[in-house]
UniProtKB/Swiss-Prot annotation:
This is Peptide methionine sulfoxide reductase A5. It is an enzyme of class 1 (oxidoreductase). Catalyzes the reduction of methionine sulfoxide (MetSO) to methionine in proteins. Plays a protective role against oxidative stress by restoring activity to proteins that have been inactivated by methionine oxidation. MSRA family specifically reduces the MetSO S-enantiomer. The keyword Signal applies. Residues 1-26 form the signal peptide. The keyword Transcription regulation does not apply. Belongs to the MsrA Met sulfoxide reductase family. Coiled coil: none annotated. It comes from the Eukaryota. GO terms for cellular component: cytoplasm. One of its GO terms (molecular function) is peptide-methionine (S)-S-oxide reductase activity. GO terms for biological process: cellular response to oxidative stress. Keywords: Oxidoreductase, Signal.
Length: 254
């Protein structure tokens, strides 16, 4: 009996030591969440919580529009949807009077609203009427949606500046307060990225909800459309080549 009690006591001490080591190392323990807690999510490094601001623009097909903003430093996430109309619950095949839009969430410490306006003007032809390029229809009209008087003033000034570049034709861009924004269907989110299955594999084939919120996915969506700056495009090319040589680990940042 004494020998059995001693053995039981030793086993108990060993179990306690193993338990302490497991907790210290973050290992998964029976019945607990253990090592998953605090683990960096797929699709990009975990970012500290920041107070983001949101801008919404309509500048033609939202497939391309989303990519135009995704690679900008300070842009946290992008998504596409419908706004500017009166129809409740619009859908891609039944938009009503809405326009295709891109919603840009950004860190104002790293990028200013003025810069987003510059990209907006540079990414489409605001003098076209009833569409953009091959995309014809009211849903492709040019709109700056504003949130408050400061954005409205900046948008107005930027429009005047754009108009002054050429007085022979009129800027058709509307400026209006943002109302309801209806997210588009999942198949339209990160459209350019989804056309490159190779890139999706590099970030672990994220589920739709993670693609929607991932900063890395927003950047790769722009990269897939070749809308990052030349330096950024080259840097991502090098990063992808490096990953391929290492045996296809998950891409976590660029």
């Amino acid at each position: 009996m004494a020998r059995g009690s001693a053995a039981a006591a030793i086993a108990g001490v060993v179990w306690v030591l193993l338990l302490l080591v497991g907790v210290a190392s973050g290992a998964r323990l029976p019945g607990g969440s253990g090592g998953n807690r605090g683990r960096e999510p797929r699709g990009g490094a975990a970012a500290a919580a920041v107070a983001t601001e949101t801008a919404v623009f309509a500048l033609g097909s939202f497939w391309r529009s989303e990519a135009a903003f995704g690679c900008l430093p300070g842009v946290i996430r992008t998504s596409v949807g419908y706004a500017g109309g009166s129809k409740a619950r619009p859908e891609y095949r039944n938009l009503g009077d809405h326009a295709e839009c891109v919603k840009v969430e950004y860190d104002p410490r790293l990028i200013q609203y003025k810069k987003l306006l510059e990209v907006f003007w540079a990414s489409h032809d605001p003098r076209e009427v009833f569409g953009q390029g091959p995309d014809v229809g009211n849903q492709y009209r040019s709109i700056i949606f504003t949130n408050g008087s400061v954005e409205a003033r900046l948008a107005g000034l930027s429009k005047e500046k754009e108009q002054a570049k050429d007085r022979r034709s009129v800027i058709t861009t509307q400026i209006q307060p943002i109302g309801a924004f209806y997210p588009a269907e999942p198949e339209h989110q990160k459209f350019e990225l989804k056309r490159k299955p190779f890139l999706l594999q590099l970030i672990g084939n994220l589920p739709e909800e993670e693609l929607l919120t991932s900063t890395l996915a927003a950047k790769l969506n722009a990269y897939a459309a070749e809308l990052c700056s030349p330096n950024t495009q080259n840097r991502i090319n090098s990063k992808i080549d490096e990953i391929a040589k290492k045996g296809w680990p998950i891409l976590r940042d660029i």
